[in-house]
Amino acid sequence: MSITFNLKIAPFSGPGIQRSKETFPATEIQITASTKSTMTTKCSFNASTDFMGKLREKVGGKADKPPVVIHPVDISSNLCMIDTLQSLGVDRYFQSEINTLLEHTYRLWKEKKKNIIFKDVSCCAIAFRLLREKGYQVSSDKLAPFADYRIRDVATILELYRASQARLYEDEHTLEKLHDWSSNLLKQHLLNGSIPDHKLHKQVEYFLKNYHGILDRVAVRRSLDLYNINHHHRIPDVADGFPKEDFLEYSMQDFNICQAQQQEELHQLQRWYADCRLDTLNYGRDVVRIANFLTSAIFGEPEFSDARLAFAKHIILVTRIDDFFDHGGSREESYKILDLVQEWKEKPAEEYGSKEVEILFTAVYNTVNDLAEKAHIEQGRCVKPLLIKLWVEILTSFKKELDSWTEETALTLDEYLSSSWVSIGCRICILNSLQYLGIKLSEEMLSSQECTDLCRHVSSVDRLLNDVQTFKKERLENTINSVGLQLAAHKGERAMTEEDAMSKIKEMADYHRRKLMQIVYKEGTVFPRECKDVFLRVCRIGYYLYSSGDEFTSPQQMKEDMKSLVYQPVKIHPLEAINV
């Protein structure tokens, strides 16, 4: 016996969507589910959780039978379920349930007696990673025994590797040891071709390649492709009476709806770019598509359209003006842009001195005024002075860098790093986008030491990694770079090779990443977690762009990721119900 019901994906609502010109129509998918299905998710807490009912409530669907209740049994299944929801990009619909499950998991973790978490290696590794990422205080010492285990199961080794990447402190030697052991073993399995499971093989390759450069939505698309019709049976059970292949189809539909909106945002960016006449400039990089891709990769939620657009516009403007300071304009013209922003007043065309200066300044002027008006509605106060201040700050940093290499000013590495983190552009992009997350941000919050530290750490990561990949080019251009300064600082000592200097700079980037993670994962801070997560996502952009090349200037892997994230919908195959 089987039943048929309609899973209705309703239009998304929220501040960002309500102001958009376009809306998405409701989409209905007919799903047939067998009442004989034994798809059971086992949960290990003392209150039943109706995941199926919650799903119906979120997406506005209706079913022909009462809500399905999931009964508590197994903590391992709970954790696998959370991991699956995250990997398929639909965890945002289940945050209250996830929070409940993790709270229960944390209570078990704190128990001194041995329980199921510590008896199962994979369960312990997943629990540690999910709890730490959520902000719970969990010691890595609980993982210490596993570093000496003779583990042959590749999936378990992979979970230990992922857990080791949650290292926050320099003295967490357990995680350092676990990382070295697990990564070497996984690489050996790849070299030997000893992972027969295709999906697992691909996962190991992906996580080993650039773990901290994995962008949220890029990873979601990859998971959906791996969990295609041939592998949907590998998805952990979600709810009794809701077959896993139906859940996969829902996740695919959700992805395609988000993608459709991101395509529309690309059209909006292209219209804005042309309206600003930035397409008439005959120098520098056109990064409209790159900006749209990067913001779509870190802001997946449909309601964050305004945040994505604000972030993307600032990536484009900062890149255009940075290129102007570096190559496109004269020193006097570059100074003129800073003077105009400080004055913040439109002028007759002849007073700008050049067409390029006029285009760049008016693009900044009109864009900031427009964003400030929208932010006023969101925040309930005027934020234009802050937005102008951010532009003065980054342009001043550009000027300082311009002066340092044109006048051949001798800088130490510390002097360089004290200001160069601003010029990478993370601060201005992030603080603009935060205005549109539906969270009120006071002036005190934005001027706090915590805000400065978050900006400095994420910017330092991106700056240092950028310097490693652009060192040889910038050396030819006689431009100051942290790798070159590192070499110069050790010139009188033992010989330091370029590889040594690059390794040292990468270690500094990892240090700032861990400091950033400490703030993001800490409870009771000035910023709510939703805001702090943005800094962590931007940190991943740095690793994505600059881990093995300069993907921002010469995209290679990004071209493929851009196709799958922005342009190519997930193909939804008709899936038959599972009858047991």
Swiss-Prot record:
Mg(2+) 1 binds at D322, D326. Mg(2+) 2 binds at D322, D326. Keywords: Chloroplast, Lyase, Magnesium, Metal-binding, Plastid, Transit peptide. Its cofactor is Mg(2+). A motif (DDXXD motif) lies at residues 322-326. The keyword Cytoplasm does not apply. One of its GO terms (molecular function) is 9,13-epoxylabda-14-ene synthase activity. Binds 3 Mg(2+) ions per subunit. It comes from the Eukaryota. Its EC number is 4.2.3.189, 4.2.3.190, 4.2.3.131. Residues 1-32 form a transit peptide. One of its GO terms (cellular component) is chloroplast. Present in both leaves and flowers, with higher levels in leaves. Pathway: Secondary metabolite biosynthesis; terpenoid biosynthesis. The keyword tRNA processing does not apply. Mg(2+) 3 binds at N466, T470, E474. It catalyses: peregrinol diphosphate = (13R)-9,13-epoxylabd-14-ene + diphosphate; (+)-copalyl diphosphate = miltiradiene + diphosphate; 8-hydroxycopalyl diphosphate = (13R)-manoyl oxide + diphosphate. It is an enzyme of class 4 (lyase). InterPro entries: Isoprenoid_synthase_dom_sf, Terpene_synth_N, Terpene_synth_N_sf, Terpene_synthase-like, Terpene_synthase_metal-bd, Terpenoid_cyclase/PrenylTrfase. Belongs to the terpene synthase family. Involved in the biosynthesis of labdane-type diterpenoid including marrubiin and other labdane-related furanoid diterpenoids with potential applications as anti-diabetics, analgesics or vasorelaxants. Terpene synthase the catalyzes the conversion of peregrinol diphosphate to 9,13(R)-epoxy-labd-14-ene, from (+)-copalyl diphosphate ((+)-CPP) to miltiradiene and from 8-hydroxycopalyl diphosphate (LPP, labda-13-en-8-ol diphosphate) to manoyl oxide. The Asp-Asp-Xaa-Xaa-Asp/Glu (DDXXD/E) motif is important for the catalytic activity, presumably through binding to Mg(2+). This is 9,13-epoxylabda-14-ene synthase, chloroplastic.
